[in-house]
Amino acid sequence: MNEVKVQRNYKDSIFRMLFKDKENLLSLYNALNQTDYTDVDGLEITTLENAIYMNYKNDVSFVFDFELMLYEHQSTVNPNMPLRDLFYVADILQKRIHDRDLYDSNLISVPLPRFVVFYNGIDSQPERQTLRLSNAYEKKQENPELELTVTVYNINLGCNEEIMNACRTLKEYAMYVERVRTYAKQMPLAEAVEKTVDECIAEEILSDFLRKNRAEAIKMSIYEYDEELHFKTLFERGRETGLEQGESRINKLNSILIHMDRLDDLKHATQDKAYQEQLMAELLSEGMQDM
């Protein structure tokens, strides 16, 4: 078998490719909202194709039923999703009203934003959790004037079964991912992915998608699994190292923060161990190598 090489830069994901399809996307919307819409013509895709932050890209966004939905797929826990979504939604809304006069006396209407993350990483997480932008504020306030909440759904196989059963594509995606992980423990990753693709096609699990996109799906699956394991290994290695390696991680963190001109974060991190660890986790989740 020829080795499949995948470069470490932004690539499409299986999740994103699946839910670029409007029928799949509407099915996912219905599953989350317990609705039964069928007209995909009313669904307006607003995904930011050029919105890349630290190797990450806005996955899927769309307007439907006067709502602006931002869907993101994550295989690593990222507490900074509210902040990223703030950037995304501001960009999307700016593009929607670019020719409107914000100084006009008439109110400019915009769709209601809603933010969802679909998590399927290997770290144990609750079936559902809420992330808040206010958690990142250096000064806490009971009712902050700017808030943004993100609902995180665990879509690993066996979680949120009501939603999974309502959206066949989402459930089959979870089955596919679980099988790749299972076989990857028994054989080389490339072989595990090939075997999974062959079996899923035979068993009618994402079969149409995999037949049409076999080569790309294999490359993406290898990349996604390898990246997930890479970040997990780095984090565990850092957490379990001794003092010398710990100091090395801290020095690396300080160097990155200085390079990014995040001097306030650097000062805060030197005074707060928990905040220091939070920054390390953030940089790992955003694709920083060798943290």
Per-region residue spans from a language model:
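Elongated, amphipathic alpha-helical interaction scaffolds
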Residues: 1-291
